[in-house]
Curated annotation (Swiss-Prot):
Keywords: Cell inner membrane, Cell membrane, Membrane. Its main location: membrane. It comes from Gloeobacter violaceus (strain ATCC 29082 / PCC 7421). NCBIfam families: membrane protein insertion efficiency factor YidD. This is Putative membrane protein insertion efficiency factor. Pfam families: YidD.
């Protein structure tokens, strides 16, 4: 499973380093959605981390105020 975790975080790092700089900053949150997902994968594993990241991306739109939204310390059922 460590290999899958490293592959997932590596893909996010690739995006952060090479793709994201080519686009204007649009994330409404701190940390950014990609960094949030990377941290969630590191903390909770690939499946739960991607789930948390997906939920975060669904909230990242112009009608949401955004702001500081760190990865939770513990995984919740929601």
């Amino acid at each position: 499973m460590e290999l899958v975790r490293r592959a997932a975080t590596g893909a996010i790092r690739f995006y952060q380093r090479f793709v994201s700089p080519l686009t204007p900053p649009t994330c409404r949150y701190v940390p950014t959605c990609s960094e949030y997902t990377r941290q969630a994968i590191e903390r909770f594993g690939v499946a739960a981390g991607i789930w948390l990241g997906t939920k975060r991306l669904c909230r990242c739109h112009p009608l949401h105020p955004g702001g500081y939204d760190p990865v939770p310390e513990r995984r919740s059922v929601r």
